[in-house]
Amino acid sequence: MITLNTEEKIFIYSWLKNILSHELTEQQLQQYQQGVFTPLFDFLSEQDLAKQINTVRNSLMQLSNLPLAHLELAADFAQLFLLNGENSALPYASAYLSEKELNQHIAFIDHLLFKYQLKFDHNLREPSDHLAVYLELLITLEKSGQKEKSFNFIQHYLLAWLIPFNKKVQKIKTETSFYQAITEILITLLNKNVKLS
């Protein structure tokens, strides 16, 4: 059974946001392969996520046998998230919502960004319907201790499009299943969070 306190949720959501926002650098991948994240993986395995973590670990082992591992993983990231909507699972709400739903989402997201005075690195140039923006807002809501608002945000704003997003991610064939496992971890945690509310 998944049981996370607020600090653990914030840490894990931050980790997921960072890993799904951009490709891992060669140095970051080396940290994974050198066991820096072993305590986190062990913890998540104890939270009913052993299957997904095993896939992550197997993918890292697979990459360790390749001469340009970080480029292979970057290619997986690009294949999954950066091509067109036909060939990739774009990490934008606009790719999965109707125009009416999207307008409601954008209005609410922009309201929260203004309310919490959140600003993003302009070098990223991500619009407000990007997954990283949604996760940053969820982290902010968790930090503020507003559990009811967090649950509402997950149920009505995140899962509304992340479920079809994840289904598409799982169907795309890549060299490793690293990112497929990561998105599955995210969806599982969000679903459990809502069910425990």
Curated annotation (Swiss-Prot):
Organism: Histophilus somni (strain 2336) (Haemophilus somnus)
UniProt KW Chaperone keyword: yes
Cellular component, GO, one term: cytoplasm
Record's keyword annotation contains Cytoplasm: yes
Gene Ontology biological process terms from the UniProt entry: protein complex oligomerization; protein folding
Biological function: Involved in the biogenesis of TorA. Acts on TorA before the insertion of the molybdenum cofactor and, as a result, probably favors a conformation of the apoenzyme that is competent for acquiring the cofactor.
Key words, A-Z: Chaperone, Cytoplasm
Domain of life where this protein originates: Bacteria
UniProt family annotation: Belongs to the TorD/DmsD family. TorD subfamily.
Xref: Gene3D superfamilies: 1.20.120.1820, HscB, C-terminal domain
Cystines in this chain: none
Annotated protein name in UniProt: Chaperone protein TorD
Compartment annotation: Cytoplasm
